[in-house]
């Protein structure tokens, strides 16, 4: 073994001898049942030499003559793999990953991305998944990543076994495969969120939109977990060895910063019938980065969330894993529990709601979504074959699949195709396929087609969807709807609709019914007249290529949830400035819109709706991406701009730029300064003075965007600084959950990677009193600069720019409001500048609650405060800049500035 380790956190275990815990390697035990032999696999420049070894604890020896049943079909599966290789295009460095920390990973471009660009969570298009049959090619295997993929080195990687074991140790990869026997067999992996989008169509869960292809099957090879734990001497239940915890290598933000971890019961870990392995090969090759290179856990029959990738530690403990992700993920809570109740009453920690084994499930894959079956003399002469997949958990065999064409009144039993043999304990770890021939005329008369499966324990699928907060384990009947259409002149046909399409792709009968429901609720006339969810409407339909043309200030269209909105007339009124719309004009910006807009804003959007996106047929654009994800870079309209004279990061406002946290400073109990490194050391941010950026993070599997103005100088090289007030939960009674992004930032460890996007904003300071506001020039000799709380940062940026130019004689008068004196941000810098430049900058504070000896105003910004500390409003002489909460702007600033002679529509510039 490479290294022995001590039980640092378990002093009750066997003491070390002279401070050293001896590694344990028993002598080889000859056995007639195995012959030592070496096999080399040359994969990705790593030579894997495997040697079968019988030197294991006899009490956990699962070997016997029947073990060969596991490998009975391996050659058959490998022939499948060989044939499928020729059908899969090479993986590439996808342009969608260019601005992320995963830009070194080759991926298949057809994968449907479910969480934007990063982290990479994706499923294959359902037709492609089924085209390859029983064994899924690795590039098309679904991927669930919580963060950045670790860069691993085979030669340096170790797996530590520690906790309640008598002989804790670290194994190198070479030791794992040479000192333990390996097993190779097929296993179907399924994400517990498979089919979640159906739940999100009923009511939004806290999870992203998995379709029905969050399932894949591979030939996995690895070392049995029970052999390793037996070698290391796992403690008995009486000795406290109750749980086996797994911990990965990636650094994640959850819980204030943690590794991905989870656990299973010791009895499961040591049960040879469960076939749990530390896998290092998939489909005959070393694991790829997205699938856990160099080693991961495979727990057959369990949800994917228990199969930790990039495995670094196995810890035997009395308690379950204490990982944030063990408790805050992969739970099925009762339908009555929402996020607020789950947090308030600690539902996450109730053991009865944890998910381990998969449930029974089945899906219709043929006909496909929007497939059209013509009805003519030829097609009606032979039956149509319905097809799909089914699986169950815990090693249970799927014994029956049934299809109904009449809503469940009658059922037809399907033919099953099981392409695996059970293990020697009778366990089945893989999906099966089903098919059923039906008469075309029966399909024509059916309103929908539904499927359900049964397993050997007579578990079956419920009729109706059972909603839960995380959207997990959805296994209601899978229904497709049928509609009559006219594919050709003089001919009719049946068009089939699946319930949803994965990710942010529009389409599916559930989306139509949901939209109809929303429309009917808001329109009582429509509510009375609606009789069919598939009625004709007057909504105009547009292709994606048509939408892309509308990407300018003259015509700005966006797509949100498949609906098209013309936002041109809203550009001048948008609170975030026209740039926030223009960087998304001509694209599907569903994810970005959902991340930053309130319910009120979503309702306002309806006033600008002009039509629907065509989701079928062909797009006339010559460079159409055919692999889902309308947020792909290739679909963004080109931006005309001058070539930058300097190396700047924000070259294209539509593209995200990765930044790395390199420094975090606590200025006060709730104020932090974060320094982020730009992609290149010689880069400047390239943010015009007065503009801001979006900071983008994936929090709880959802995109979160917040606007920030850097406090670093505009010419800072290689980094940016953000001063952020952290809004902690349970501090302010009106906001019990606190600030999502600020708490996330506070929890990030050094080295974390986020994305920024910009420039954004409608105000730009050009120098020497000149501004450009929504394309119109403005000038002032004197500036009234009014800020509330964190709203000081754009004001700070303008001050910094003016004072850095000795020739800029603009006078500045700052009134800065906060709740308490301790809440004042960048106070030291403001007062330092005011003392140094007394003729150019004056600063006055207003606090709601003052301490004894406070020398500034108390209460709120009032007319007397403004008259005393800022200049009168004179056309061509003065402008007011403001950034703060809306009530401050509306009630304290606008009416009082108007009294002082300001034209608040023209002379009050609100960031």
Curated annotation (Swiss-Prot):
Pfam families: Cyt-b5, FAD_binding_6, Mo-co_dimer, NAD_binding_1, Oxidored_molyb. GO terms for biological process: nitrate assimilation; nitric oxide biosynthetic process. Residues 654-766 form the FAD-binding FR-type domain. Heme binds at residues 574, 597. It is an enzyme of class 1 (oxidoreductase). Its cofactor is FAD; heme; Mo-molybdopterin. Mo-molybdopterin binds at residue 191. FAD binds at residues 706-709, 723-728, 735, 740-742, 793. SUPFAM superfamilies: Cytochrome b5-like heme/steroid binding domain, E set domains, Ferredoxin reductase-like, C-terminal NADP-linked domain, Oxidoreductase molybdopterin-binding domain, Riboflavin synthase domain-like. Its EC number is 1.7.1.1. Keywords: Disulfide bond, FAD, Flavoprotein, Heme, Iron, Metal-binding, Molybdenum, NAD, Nitrate assimilation, Oxidoreductase. Binds 1 FAD. Residues 53-72 are annotated as: Disordered. InterPro entries: Cbr1-like_FAD-bd_dom, Cyt_B5-like_heme/steroid-bd, Cyt_B5-like_heme/steroid_sf, Cyt_B5_heme-BS, FAD-bd_FR_type, Flavoprot_Pyr_Nucl_cyt_Rdtase, FNR_nucleotide-bd, Ig_E-set. Residues 56-68 have a biased composition (Acidic residues). Residues 539-614 form the Cytochrome b5 heme-binding domain. It catalyses: nitrite + NAD(+) + H2O = nitrate + NADH + H(+). One of its GO terms (molecular function) is FAD binding. Homodimer. PANTHER family: SULFITE OXIDASE, MITOCHONDRIAL, SULFITE REDUCTASE. Belongs to the nitrate reductase family. Nitrate reductase is a key enzyme involved in the first step of nitrate assimilation in plants, fungi and bacteria. This is Nitrate reductase [NADH], clone PBNBR1412.
């Amino acid at each position: 073994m490479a290294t022995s380790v001590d039980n640092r956190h378990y002093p009750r275990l066997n003491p070390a001898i002279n401070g050293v815990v001896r590694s344990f390697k028993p002598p080889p035990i000859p056995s007639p049942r195995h012959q030592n032999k070496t096999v080399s696999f040359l994969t990705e420049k790593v030579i894997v030499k495997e040697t079968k070894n019988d030197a294991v604890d006899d009490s956990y020896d699962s070997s016997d003559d029947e073990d060969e049943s596991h490998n009975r079909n391996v050659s058959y599966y490998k022939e499948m793999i060989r044939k499928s290789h020729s059908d899969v295009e090479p993986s590439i460095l996808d342009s969608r990953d260019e601005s992320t920390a995963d830009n070194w990973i080759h991926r298949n471009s057809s994968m449907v991305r479910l969480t934007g660009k990063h982290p990479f969570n994706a499923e294959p298009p359902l037709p492609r998944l089924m085209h390859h049959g029983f064994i899924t090619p690795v590039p098309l295997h679904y991927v669930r990543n919580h963060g950045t993929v670790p860069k691993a080195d085979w030669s340096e990687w170790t797996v530590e076994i520690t906790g309640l074991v008598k002989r804790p140790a670290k194994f190198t990869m070479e030791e794992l495969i040479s000192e333990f026997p390996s097993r190779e067999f097929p296993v179907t992996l399924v994400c517990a969120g498979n089919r979640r989008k159906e739940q999100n169509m009923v009511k939004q869960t806290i999870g992203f939109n998995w379709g029905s292809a969050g399932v894949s099957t591979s030939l996995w090879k690895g070392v049995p977990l029970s052999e390793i734990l037996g070698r290391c001497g796992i403690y008995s239940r009486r000795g406290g060895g109750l749980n086996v915890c797994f911990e990965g290598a990636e650094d994640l933000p959850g819980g204030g910063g943690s590794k991905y971890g989870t656990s299973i019961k010791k009895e499961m870990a040591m049960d040879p019938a469960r076939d749990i392995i530390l896998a290092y090969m998939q489909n005959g090759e070393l694991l790829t980065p997205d699938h856990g290179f160099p080693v991961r856990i495979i727990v057959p029959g369990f949800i994917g969330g228990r199969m930790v990738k990039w495995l670094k530690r196995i810890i035997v403990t009395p308690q379950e894993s204490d990982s944030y992700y063990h408790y805050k993920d992969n739970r099925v809570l009762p339908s009555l529990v929402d996020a607020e109740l789950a947090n308030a009453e600690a539902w996450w920690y109730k053991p009865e709601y944890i998910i381990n084994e998969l449930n029974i499930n089945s899906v219709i894959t043929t006909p496909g979504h929007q497939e059209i079956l013509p009805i003519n003399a030829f097609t009606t002469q032979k039956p149509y074959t319905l097809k799909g997949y089914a699986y169950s958990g815990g090693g249970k065999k799927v014994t029956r699949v049934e299809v109904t064409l009449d809503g469940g009144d009658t059922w037809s039993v399907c033919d099953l195709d099981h392409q695996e043999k059970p293990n020697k304990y009778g366990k089945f770890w893989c999906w099966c396929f089903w098919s059923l021939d039906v008469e075309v005329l029966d399909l024509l008369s059916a309103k929908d087609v539904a499927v359900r499966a049964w397993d050997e324990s007579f578990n079956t699928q419920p009729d109706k969807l059972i909603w839960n907060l995380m959207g997990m384990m959805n296994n209601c009947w899978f229904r497709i709807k049928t509609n009559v259409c006219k594919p050709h002149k003089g001919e009719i046909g049946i068009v089939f609709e699946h319930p949803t399409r994965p990710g942010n792709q529009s389409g599916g009968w559930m989306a139509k019914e949901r939209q109809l429901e929303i429309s009917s609720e808001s329109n009582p006339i429509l509510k009375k007249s609606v009789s069919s969810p598939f009625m004709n409407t007057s909504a105009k339909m547009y292709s994606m290529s048509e939408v892309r043309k509308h990407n300018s200030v003259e015509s700005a269209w966006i797509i949100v949830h498949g609906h098209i909105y013309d936002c041109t007339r809203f550009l001048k009124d948008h609170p975030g400035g026209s740039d926030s719309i223009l960087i998304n004009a001509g694209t599907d910006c569903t994810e970005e819109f959902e991340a930053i807009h309130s319910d009120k804003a979503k309702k306002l959007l309806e006033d600008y709706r002009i039509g629907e996106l065509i989701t079928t047929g062909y797009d006339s654009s010559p460079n159409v991406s055919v692999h889902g994800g309308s947020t792909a870079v290739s679909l963004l309209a080109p931006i005309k701009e001058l070539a930058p004279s300097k190396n700047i990061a924000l070259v294209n406002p539509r593209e995200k730029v990765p930044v790395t946290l390199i420094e975090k400073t606590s200025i006060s109990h709730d104020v932090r300064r974060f320094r982020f490194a730009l992609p290149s050391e010689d880069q400047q941010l390239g943010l015009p003075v007065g503009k801001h950026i979006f900071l983008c993070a994936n929090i709880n599997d959802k995109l979160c965007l917040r606007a920030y103005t850097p406090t670093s100088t505009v010419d800072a090289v290689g980094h940016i600084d953000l001063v952020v007030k952290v809004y902690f939960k349970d501090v302010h009674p009106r906001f019990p959950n606190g600030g999502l992004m600020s708490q996330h930032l506070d929890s990030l460890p050094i080295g974390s990677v986020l994305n920024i996007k910009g420039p954004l904003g409608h105000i730009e300071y050009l120098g020497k009193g000149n501004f450009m506001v929504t394309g119109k020039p403005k000038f002032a000799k004197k500036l009234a600069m009014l800020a509330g709380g964190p709203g000081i940062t754009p004001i700070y940026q303008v001050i910094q720019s003016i004072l850095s130019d000795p020739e800029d004689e603009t006078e500045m008068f700052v009134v800065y409001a906060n709740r308490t004196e301790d809440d004042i941000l960048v106070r030291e810098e403001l007062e330092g500048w005011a003392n140094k430049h007394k003729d150019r900058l004056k600063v006055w504070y207003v606090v709601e609650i003052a301490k004894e000896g406070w020398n500034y105003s108390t209460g709120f910004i009032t007319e007397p405060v403004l008259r005393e500390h800022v200049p009168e409003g004179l056309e061509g002489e003065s402008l007011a800049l403001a950034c703060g909460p809306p009530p401050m702007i509306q009630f304290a600033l606008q009416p009082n500035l108007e009294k002082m002679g300001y034209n608040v529509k023209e002379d009050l510039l609100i960031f």
